[in-house]
Amino acid sequence: LVTVSQKNGNLFDRFRDRLMFPIIDVRGNVIGFGGRIMNSSDKSAAKYLNSPETLIFNKRKNLFALNLAKKSKLGYLILVEGYMDAIALHQYGFDCAVASLGTALTEDGANLLSRYTEQVVLIYDGDEAGQNATQRAIPILEKAGLQVKVLKMRDAKDPDEYLKKFGADRFRILLEESANRVEYQLNAILKKYDLRDDEQKVQYLQESAGLIGSLSSAVQREVYG
């Protein structure tokens, strides 16, 4: 918890002004800590900060709250961006939520998920950065053999905010409306173009056709073609 300054060699609190969370592996062992910044006006500081990597703590190979979510009976896991999102989901009864450890989803993380479920619902932040991260996560999850659905946040920036504003029942309805990953990606392509413009319409059709053509399942290609 104490770090040596690279500037002057002094000791300082690595997690000062941060709300701290224990990071627990799937065996129930505390392997590190994560800290969320409390002063949101400090734009220069990272939103989340983890313990330094050690022989027992590798953030690429662990997921926050998986020690709890692996026991869920819901039949799927929810993957979110932040610890607060995962905690809020558990508090509101969605006990299948996990979060990456302050970094983008890795193949190690996806493979870890595949040990406990066959389906993952991605619920990243609704901003551009969150949606870009969603697009990057989809092929990583599919490579691990997981079925992927996507819930795009609306009326709130993230699950934590949505649950506090609207409650569990509204979120449950939203969750049931999650799109499969092909529908999500086709809709994302559609939003890039103005179909009233012939040139943009051609570009939309070309990009959509490219996505559909890349599908490994002949049935999917038939359905979406």
Regions found by a protein language model. Give the residues of each.
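Phosphate-handling DNA/RNA-contact segment within nucleic-acid enzymes
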Residues: 1-116, 120, 133-134
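Glycine- and other small-residue-rich loops at beta-strand/loop junctions that grip anionic moieties
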Residues: 58, 78, 98-102, 126, ...
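A broad, structural surface signal
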Residues: 21, 71, 111, 135, ...
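C-terminal or mid-to-C-terminal helical accessory/interaction module adjacent to the motor/catalytic core
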Residues: 146-225
